[in-house]
Structure formats: structure tokens, C-alpha cells
């Protein structure tokens, strides 16, 4: 079941869903608008291969900065954070979707990481890309996406109880932590 506006506001007011900071004006009929934070991380162009199992390759040739805005260049991939910290209970999951007005500028909000598990707490790392032929400026604090909340049965092992929860309590835009997975059944 997808939560509607009054349910979203009620769940947040009662502390069942944590949104910090929370602005009631951002509650939409079937979602909650979320805003862009001020931390940005991106890869510099080069020919070095990124190997998801080699931590050092995940972090080389990266730049990061905090700022009130960021100009996303055509074709550029940039990680950004949400302004809001999101905390979910063990029976609510969320998906993040882009805002239509932002998409119409050529900005994709996430590549594939749009699912937020029950039990997650932290800022959400956005995997943004500019498919426009022109640079697009995005501002910290601007509504950039929306969270849709789904009520499920209580899960047996929510994200905050998983021993390998790599992104629990993350703050700032977070580079992939795929290197923390073990190689299994690889020939």
C-alpha cells in the first residue's frame, strides 16, 4: 500500500518515519518532495578502470566539494546527497523518483539505486546525470526528487540489523562501497 499525503504527514509527526529536517509544505498527494544537499562527488575523466572490488580504484580520480550550487556538465555523472536524513521503520520501504520539472532540464536523479530498504537511516546518495547538451545548475535546498512510501509486512532482518549494511547512517554523497562484498562463485 502506498501512503497518501495525510498518512505521510501523520507517520512523520508521530516519529514512525524520520525526516530531518521536515517541511510539511513538501508533502504531495502520494509522495514527499526531498531537497538537494550541498555535498557533491564526481569522477575526473581518465582511462583508468574502476574495479568495484578494488577500493583504491573507487576513490582515485575523484573530486568533491560542498557548495550552494553545482553545475552538472553535459554527460557528467555526479553523486550528491539529500538535505534530508531519512529513517524508515521495519515495515515501510521507499523509492526515490525524480521530479518532472528537473527531468525536463535533462537531469536524471538516480541511475538504478532508487530503492530504500526498511530499517535504513541516513541521507540518500543521488546518482545524477545530465543528458542535456548544456550544463545545468542545481542548487542546495531545491526540491530535486520525491520519496514514495510503501507499507509492507515487517521484515525479519531490516537494513539496520544487517551486518553488511554498507550505507547505514551515511552522511554526505557516498562513493560505492561495492568493494566490501566478497567475490563468490567467480571463474
Swiss-Prot record:
GO terms for biological process: dUMP biosynthetic process; dUTP biosynthetic process; nucleobase-containing small molecule interconversion. DCTP binds at residues 99-104, 117, 125-127, 146, 159, 166, 170. CDD domains: trimeric_dUTPase. Pfam families: DCD. It catalyses: dCTP + 2 H2O = dUMP + NH4(+) + diphosphate. GO terms for molecular function: dCTP deaminase (dUMP-forming) activity; dCTP deaminase activity; nucleotide binding. Disulfide bonds: none annotated. It comes from the Archaea. The active site is at 127 (proton donor/acceptor). PANTHER family: DCTP DEAMINASE (PTHR42680:SF3). Bifunctional enzyme that catalyzes both the deamination of dCTP to dUTP and the hydrolysis of dUTP to dUMP without releasing the toxic dUTP intermediate. This is dCTP deaminase, dUMP-forming.
Amino acid at each position: 500500500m502506498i501512503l497518501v499525503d495525510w498518512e505521510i504527514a501523520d507517520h512523520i509527526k508521530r516519529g514512525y518515519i524520520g525526516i530531518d529536517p521536515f517541511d510539511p509544505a513538501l508533502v504531495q498527494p502520494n509522495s514527499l518532495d526531498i531537497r538537494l544537499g550541498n555535498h557533491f562527488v564526481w569522477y575526473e575523466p581518465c582511462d583508468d578502470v574502476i574495479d568495484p572490488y578494488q577500493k583504491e580504484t573507487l576513490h582515485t580520480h575523484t573530486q568533491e566539494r560542498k557548495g550552494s550550487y553545482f553545475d552538472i556538465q553535459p554527460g557528467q555523472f555526479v553523486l550528491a546527497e539529500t538535505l534530508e536524513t531519512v529513517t524508515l521503520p521495519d515495515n515501510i520501504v521507499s523509492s526515490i523518483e525524480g521530479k518532472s520539472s528537473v527531468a525536463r532540464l535533462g537531469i536524471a536523479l538516480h541511475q538504478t539505486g532508487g530503492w530504500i530498504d526498511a530499517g535504513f537511516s541516513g541521507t540518500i546518495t543521488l546518482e545524477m546525470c545530465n543528458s542535456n547538451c548544456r550544463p545545468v545548475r542545481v542548487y542546495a535546498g531545491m526540491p530535486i526528487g520525491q520519496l514514495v512510501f510503501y507499507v509492507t509486512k515487517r521484515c525479519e532482518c531490516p537494513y539496520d540489523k544487517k551486518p553488511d549494511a554498507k550505507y547505514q547512517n551515511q552522511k554526505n554523497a557516498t562513493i560505492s562501497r561495492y568493494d566490501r562484498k566478497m567475490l563468490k562463485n567467480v571463474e
